[in-house]
A protein has these predicted regions:
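Structural preference for beta-strand elements that scaffold enzyme active sites
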Residues: 32, 86, 111-115, 140-144, ...
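Aromatic-anchored, glycine/proline-accented short structural segments
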Residues: 170-232
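Active-site-proximal loop/turn and secondary-structure-junction residues that shape catalytic pockets
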Residues: 49, 118-120, 147-151, 178-180, ...
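Short flexible/disordered coil segments
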Residues: 63-72, 170, 178-183, 204-210, ...
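Active-site-adjacent beta->alpha loops and helix N-cap segments on the catalytic face
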Residues: 125-126, 149-163, 180-184, 205-217, ...
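Short, aromatic/basic amphipathic alpha-helical patches
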Residues: 131, 162, 187-188, 215-216, ...
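Shared catalytic-loop signature of beta/alpha-barrel
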Residues: 208-209, 215-221, 226-322
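N-terminal capping/lid subdomain adjacent to the active-site entrance of alpha/beta enzymes
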Residues: 1-172, 177-179, 183, 190-195, ...
Length: 322
């Protein structure tokens, strides 16, 4: 079967910059993909790397693809392509094949209530107050706070204030984006390991320090994120929680099969997608919620703007990028 591939550039700014130990994220840009077959079927994808070096690799990979190609060639390409390209091509193929979407028995699933993403530093406290006011309290909410962005002493003080404000039914995830050293990460774990509100410390140490991550995981809950992107073999060997960002990790049909098989301790997280990528994120999060270890997905509500670029209708997203 011959497929026709179209690409369209997109760009949008976050509502406010996201500060992490790895830097500051202000906008997202990439390519939307439209894949048509000769039967009138259409599949949609999105390619949006986070790192500049990966952006250039994705641009080269997309430029090397012809506008028309057989399905077998596309399948071969996406297996070797950078992760974001693999996601975009695999997502479009899966929809075209009826694996997901209107042609699938379940259609597109909706995600459960997400975790709330708190900004780094002292802005966290103000954001927490806004959340409490808008929701009428913080009971049974899950919060993710970006840490390792300010002096450790200040963040430890902020942590104590945060813990004082969180009710017993709330849940807390702390994301260091690999920004701590071993002694700092161990100090945070010792403080929090006996707190029933702790979900996990997320990527507390650098990707290169897998031995340190293993040692820390013996003390308390550790979730890997960046490690899974840079060392994909850990997706099959890490026994703790995995923060999975499907838009970055390649063909989404692989993660789809994992969740359909009921593999535990996968938590779905956003890379700030358009409406096309968001459909996949929410569908996978909906599947995860049906599995053995349901967890609030990291959808980062309130960080991306509204409008047709974020519609559930891919035609509207495509038109908005024109």
């Amino acid at each position: 079967m011959t497929l026709r591939l179209q690409r369209r550039r997109f760009r949008f700014a976050l509502l406010r910059p996201l500060r992490t130990a790895a830097g500051e994220l202000r906008e997202r840009c990439g390519w939307l993909l439209r894949l048509d077959d000769d039967q009138g079927g259409v599949g949609w994808g999105e390619v949006a790397p986070l790192q500049l070096q990966q952006f250039m690799a994705c641009e080269q990979a997309l430029a090397a693809l012809p506008d028309e190609l057989p399905q077998a060639q596309l399948e071969a390409v996406l297996r070797e392509a950078p992760g974001p390209v693999g996601f975009g091509l695999g997502a479009a193929l899966a929809e075209l094949q009826g694996v997901v979407g209107a042609g699938a028995p379940q259609g597109w699933l909706k995600a459960p209530a997400p975790a709330l993403l708190l900004p780094a530093g002292e802005a966290m406290l103000a954001a927490l107050e806004v959340a409490a006011a808008s929701m009428g309290g913080l009971e049974s909410c899950t919060f993710k706070w970006k840490v390792a962005t300010a002096p450790d002493g200040l963040e430890r003080q902020l942590l104590e204030q945060l813990l004082q404000r969180l009710p017993p039914t709330a849940r807390l995830r702390l994301d260091a984006n690999g920004g701590w050293d071993r002694s700092t990460a161990e100090a945070w774990m010792q403080r929090l390991r006996d707190d029933p509100r702790l979900d996990w410390l997320e990527q507390p140490l650098a990707v290169e320090d897998q031995a340190g991550l293993d040692q820390l995981a013996a003390l308390g809950p550790v979730a890997l994120d960046e490690s899974l992107d840079q060392q994909p073999e850990l997706r099959s060997s890490w026994s703790g929680w995995q923060v999975r960002r499907p838009a970055l990790e390649g063909d989404p049909r692989l993660l789809l099969r994992e969740l359909q098989a009921g593999l535990p301790q996968r938590m779905l997280s956003t890379a700030f997608e358009t409406g096309i990528g968001r459909r996949w994120l929410e569908h996978l999060a909906g599947l995860q919620a049906q599995g053995p270890t349901p967890a609030a997905p990291g959808l980062a509500p309130g960080w991306t703007p509204a409008g047709p670029m974020f519609s559930n209708d891919p035609e509207q997203v495509w038109a908005a990028a024109a």
